[in-house]
């Protein structure tokens, strides 16, 4: 476990798959500006060129060999994303972050099968990435929402994370690491995986879990929270969502009585987490556990 942050820190060496595309190029520049060590990019057929002074390679394998990268972020369209993820796994990268939305569920099942055979960790797909404020950002999280501190944040929602962290930052509560696991039904890293990392991380004093309706990820997290020594605050989005209607994320759908906000909030409360009723209550509850 790293001494200073989970998943990424100032020594993380990042390549951008799809760096010559609009999003890849734009976000590579923003990561560079933040201080992230973006050491290379990959676009088949564009090897030998440069983007913002970052060398571009034809394959991930070549990029890793030349740059000693340990992390990749993927900005490629959904129909190419599975191959891009597999290529990153095969190159032996420690962490693969996939921002791409709309990867078919069947492909995600193939990705999960492959994950069991490799040493890589996958964050996403359909996620905003990860930031250790003041150290490194791998993803598209807006810098100004975050400041360095000792609250670990893990979330299924992207924009909600930015809003909550901005509120925390304005209230003087900084974050150790903020992890967006993504809103798809089958994420790589899960709430439980990230909670384990925060539990072991010396810099993290408390954890905020931001969940949403649909699936059972929050209920599984609640089971793990029972054995955590660190205080956990939770917020669940989607309390007013109608059953049977997909809300924004593919994973955000209530089927029958499973996946409702009430069921998740009850499970988290029973596990000993402090559950914030509204967005505005999050700061109050976090402040309470950090005092």
Curated annotation (Swiss-Prot):
GO terms for cellular component: succinate-CoA ligase complex (ADP-forming). Its EC number is 6.2.1.5. GO terms for biological process: tricarboxylic acid cycle. Coiled coil: none annotated. Succinyl-CoA synthetase functions in the citric acid cycle (TCA), coupling the hydrolysis of succinyl-CoA to the synthesis of either ATP or GTP and thus represents the only step of substrate-level phosphorylation in the TCA. The alpha subunit of the enzyme binds the substrates coenzyme A and phosphate, while succinate binding and nucleotide specificity is provided by the beta subunit. Belongs to the succinate/malate CoA ligase alpha subunit family. Pathway: Carbohydrate metabolism; tricarboxylic acid cycle; succinate from succinyl-CoA (ligase route): step 1/1. GO terms for molecular function: nucleotide binding; succinate-CoA ligase (ADP-forming) activity; succinate-CoA ligase (GDP-forming) activity. Keywords: Ligase, Nucleotide-binding, Tricarboxylic acid cycle. It catalyses: succinate + ATP + CoA = succinyl-CoA + ADP + phosphate; GTP + succinate + CoA = succinyl-CoA + GDP + phosphate. The active site is at residue 249. The gene is sucD1. Substrate binds at residue 162. Heterotetramer of two alpha and two beta subunits. PANTHER family: SUCCINATE--COA LIGASE [ADP_GDP-FORMING] SUBUNIT ALPHA, MITOCHONDRIAL (PTHR11117:SF2), SUCCINYL-COA LIGASE SUBUNIT ALPHA (PTHR11117). CoA binds at residues 20-23, 46, 99-101. Gene3D superfamilies: NAD(P)-binding Rossmann-like Domain, Succinyl-CoA synthetase domains. It holds the Pfam family Ligase_CoA. This is Succinate--CoA ligase [ADP-forming] subunit alpha 1. It comes from Archaeoglobus fulgidus (strain ATCC 49558 / DSM 4304 / JCM 9628 / NBRC 100126 / VC-16). It is an enzyme of class 6 (ligase).
